[in-house]
Amino acid sequence: VTSYTCMDLFSQETLLRNAEKALLDLVNNTADLDLLTIVGCPLVSGSQLINAAVAFQRGEILGVVPKSYLPSYKEFQEERWFTASSHLQQSMITIGNREVPLDCYLIFEYDEVRVGIEICEDLWVPIPPSSELAMQGANLIFNLSASNELIGKHAYLRSLICQQSARCIAGYVYASAGFG
């Protein structure tokens, strides 16, 4: 809903309030579609800000998946703004007037598909959340990303995605704001 480039604007209440409003508009405007939709959005859980993926269908938010691994090297400073899933104090989050599950290991069922979600950096760690999601029965993993562009990174990323898909015995859908 917002952009990864918001950086210090993530601490602005106006940005967070309007991001949640835009998210609720998306949920409401797709209520007549039988489509599982996943969008990224910064959300406040208690007093903690999370980089999250929100899954919704037919006007209902099904759950929120917080990012597990926050990079804090080179140009990445996510720990400055966000809280990692392992440090969250709640397992539910209120969006608008709806209380929904909040967990990095949620699985969403859509027809015959069991969908798991991870966010960008989560794929790059030794044991990604998608590995656990696959062990719990997910057969399709979505990764929401806003990865930067570096020479040679695309080939490495493509290889990483193919390897993780094979390890999980699952389809792996990688959607980035950049190339690919």
Named regions from a protein language model:
Residues 1-180:
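Enzyme catalytic cores with a strong preference for nitrogen-chemistry domains
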